[in-house]
Amino acid sequence: GKPYALLSRRAVQQKCMEEYLPTLSPGVILDARVTHLEPFGCFVDIGCGISSLIPIDAISVSRISHPKDRFKVSQDIKAVVRSVDENGRITLSHKELLGTWEENAALFENGQTVAGIIRSVEEYGVFVELTPNLAGLAEPRDDVYVGQQASVFIKSLIPDLIPEKMKVKLIILDAFDAQYSPERPRYFIENGILSHWRYSPDSAAKLIETVF
């Protein structure tokens, strides 16, 4: 019969890992594919069969109740290496690629009516996500709930008035239930290596940053 080569999938995967893992260090931006979603985070395949976790608090600045609010299985995304432990286990982050406060705020203007998603309902107000890395606060309401789509009026973008504060004041015009499928995020950074990332403006009283 004809000669054939018997390849061990495990051996190929092991060789791939041996060559790939040394290239992964904190700050490296890479491609990933979502494999499954858990309440605590999102598992992704980063190549060579390597599974890595993006913790829920590292997915975006705007808080979500479950990773399914941001991702879906088989979705291709970008991620950045946050840490690699002594066993080669890799933890990733995602929010650093979604733009700073100023970059996201620049997409909007005072007086605009835009779409958002209600992410949190508190006694002092309702947080509405405008982008994954930007949320605004509306007056308290007891007739809305987390997960609803909302039409909001941008009352003020605080940097126009007080650069030290990162606030967007909103008025909820309408809130309604709607099925939506997570879309590919808008990435402000898609490749390279990050040494640090600062979300807050230079003049902000509160420093929000990631050091890799």
Give the location of each predicted region.
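OB-fold/S1-family RNA-binding modules
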Residues: 1-6, 31, 39, 76-89, ...
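Secondary-structure junction/capping motif
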Residues: 6-11, 66, 93-96, 100-103, ...
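A cross-kingdom feature marking solvent-exposed beta-strand/loop segments within repeated
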Residues: 15-26, 51-73, 99-102, 134-149
